[in-house]
Amino acid sequence: MADLANEEKPAIAPPVFVFQKDKGQKSPAEQKNLSDSGEEPRGEAEAPHHGTGHPESAGEHALEPPAPAGASASTPPPPAPEAQLPPFPRELAGRSAGGSSPEGGEDSDREDGNYCPPVKRERTSSLTQFPPSQSEERSSGFRLKPPTLIHGQAPSAGLPSQKPKEQQRSVLRPAVLQAPQPKALSQTVPSSGTNGVSLPADCTGAVPAASPDTAAWRSPSEAADEVCALEEKEPQKNESSNASEEEACEKKDPATQQAFVFGQNLRDRVKLINESVDEADMENAGHPSADTPTATNYFLQYISSSLENSTNSADASSNKFVFGQNMSERVLSPPKLNEVSSDANRENAAAESGSESSSQEATPEKESLAESAAAYTKATARKCLLEKVEVITGEEAESNVLQMQCKLFVFDKTSQSWVERGRGLLRLNDMASTDDGTLQSRLVMRTQGSLRLILNTKLWAQMQIDKASEKSIRITAMDTEDQGVKVFLISASSKDTGQLYAALHHRILALRSRVEQEQEAKMPAPEPGAAPSNEEDDSDDDDVLAPSGATAAGAGDEGDGQTTGST
C-alpha cells in the first residue's frame, strides 16, 4: 500500500496543476497519442467497480495537499510514470481529467472516489423536462463531447477538464428572456425543442449522438477540436446558440414537426400575406439583427404591415370622400338654385346685376359647406321679401279723437249670450261733412296683429248707448257681416270706458238737436187769421201737443240722469 500511495501522487497531481493552466493547451496530436495507450480501456471498464470499493483511496485523494502552481508551470510531470500505473490510480486520473459531478465545483476532482457517472440519467431527464432544464441539457452535452468515459477512449491523466467551472455546477436558473444572438453554432443543440417537441434527426445530426456507441465512432482528434472550441465559448453564447440552432432546424425542415407550436409556419396557415410582407421577411432574413430572430418573429412583421396598411388606407380614404366638400360636383340640384335666383332677378330688375355676381361668387368650383349653405339661404330668402306698399286704411280724411284697447262682444239672439268678436284697437274718428260743415263721426275697430275689421259704424241720432258697468258700454250699431243692427258690448278699462261714453253721448246729443232743428224748419208757419178761430180747436190742439211735450221732457230728463250718472 505504501508503494501504491507513492505512485498515486505523481498520477493525481498533474490534473490539479494542468487544470489551472490555459484550457486549450493540449494539441490534437498530443491528445491522440495519450488516447492510444493500451491500458486505458481496461481502466475505464473497471471504473464503476473500483469507485465504490476503495474509500480509503478516496480519502487519501481528498486529503492530499495540492502542489504549488509555480512548480507545475516550470517543471511539467513526465508522462512515463503514468503508463506504468496500476488500474486503480489510472482510473482516478482518467476520472479527474474527464469531468466531475455537477455539485463539485473546484473540489470536484478531489472527491471522485464516490463518483458514479449519471450520464444517461441526466440525458433522459433532459428529454422529458421543459425549458427550465437547459442547464442540465448543457451539462450533459458538454460531458458527452470529450470522450473520456466511453469505452476506454479517455485521454491521459494530464488532460485538463473540458468543462468550465460555471458548467460543472448544475444550478437551476430561470429562463433567459433575452433575444438570441445571430451567431449560429452547430456544436450544441439539445435533443428537445423549446416547447418540448422532439426535433428531427437531421437537425441534431451535426451534434454528437447521445448514446455511447455513436460517441465511440468519432476519432479522438475531432473530440479534441470540439473541446478546444467549446472551452472558448461563454455560457451565455451557448444559450443563444441553442436558440439560434433550433430556429435554423425549424427553417430546414418545418414539415417534419408533428406537433403544433404557436407562432410557427404562419406563412402556410395565414392567407393574408402581401408581397410587401414577403419582401420585408426576405430583408430581415438577409440582414439579421440582434433584437429580432431571423424570419421567425412574424407578429412584429404583421403589426408593422398592418400599421402601414392602415396609414395607406387612411390616405386613400382621405383622398376619396370628405363630407360637405365639392357639393356642386356631386349634387344634381344646383341648376335649381340658379333658376330660383333668375326668377328673383326677374322680379327685382333693379338688383339683377348684383344678384348674379353674388350667386357666381357664392358658387365657386370647390366651395365649403358653410359657403354653399349661405348661398342657398340667400337664394331662397329673396322669395320672402315683399315689396313695400303704401298702407291705405280709408281713415286718411278723418281726424282721430279717441283710441283705446278693448274687447268686442256681440249679442246672439238665438243663444241669448255674448259672443266675442275679437280684441284690438278701437278708434273714434270725426269727419267734416262737405254739405254744411257738420261733423260726421264713426267707430272703427280692427283685431290686433292681423288688423281684420270687426266694427265699422257711423253715429246717428237714434243710436242707443248706455253704460252696462264701470268697465263696459252697451251700444247698438251696424254689423258689417249681415248689414243689420245688432247690440254690441265694449269691454275696456274704467278710464277708457268713461272717456268713450262721454264722447259718444256728446256726439249723439248733437245729432239729436240737429234733427230737431231740421224738423222745426220743415214745419210750415201758422197764418194770423186762423189763430182766433175757435177755442175748442185750440184746447184740442193743446191736449194733443201736451203728451208729446211731456214725453219729450221725460226723454230729456232721462238723458240728463244718464249724463250725471256717467260723470
Curated annotation (Swiss-Prot):
Phosphorylation at Ser-126 promotes its import into the nucleus. It is found in: Cytoplasm; Nucleus. Disulfide bonds: none annotated. Residues 1-263, 332-373, 515-567 are annotated as: Disordered. Residues 534-544 have a biased composition (Acidic residues). Residues 75-89 have a biased composition (Pro residues). The modification N-acetylalanine is found at residue 2. Residues 125-134, 184-197 have a biased composition (Polar residues). The modification N6-acetyllysine is found at residues 9, 21. The keyword Protein transport applies. SUPFAM superfamilies: PH domain-like. The keyword Lyase does not apply. Residues 1-10, 39-49 have a biased composition (Basic and acidic residues). Residues 347-362, 549-567 have a biased composition (Low complexity). GO terms for cellular component: cytoplasm; nucleoplasm; nucleus. Widely expressed with high levels in testis and heart. The modification Phosphothreonine is found at residues 75, 124. Keywords: Acetylation, Cytoplasm, Nucleus, Phosphoprotein, Protein transport, Transport. Changing residue 221 to A: Does not affect translocation into the nucleus. GO terms for molecular function: R-SMAD binding; small GTPase binding. Gene3D superfamilies: Pleckstrin-homology domain (PH domain)/Phosphotyrosine-binding domain (PTB) (2.30.29.30). The modification Phosphoserine is found at residues 100-101, 108, 126, 219, 333, 353, 355, 372, 539. Interacts with CHC1 in a Ran-stimulated manner. Interacts with XPO1. Interacts (via its C-terminal R domain) with SMAD2 (dephosphorylated form via its MH1 and MH2 domains); the interaction results in the nuclear export of SMAD2 and termination of the TGF-beta signaling. Interacts (via its C-terminal R domain) with SMAD3 (dephosphorylated form via its MH1 domain); the interaction results in the nuclear export of SMAD3 and termination of the TGF-beta signaling. Acts as a cofactor for XPO1/CRM1-mediated nuclear export, perhaps as export complex scaffolding protein. Bound to XPO1/CRM1, stabilizes the XPO1/CRM1-cargo interaction. In the absence of Ran-bound GTP prevents binding of XPO1/CRM1 to the nuclear pore complex. Binds to CHC1/RCC1 and increases the guanine nucleotide exchange activity of CHC1/RCC1. Recruits XPO1/CRM1 to CHC1/RCC1 in a Ran-dependent manner. Negative regulator of TGF-beta signaling through interaction with the R-SMAD proteins, SMAD2 and SMAD3, and mediating their nuclear export. This is Ran-binding protein 3. The lineage of its organism: Eukaryota, Metazoa, Chordata, Craniata, Vertebrata.
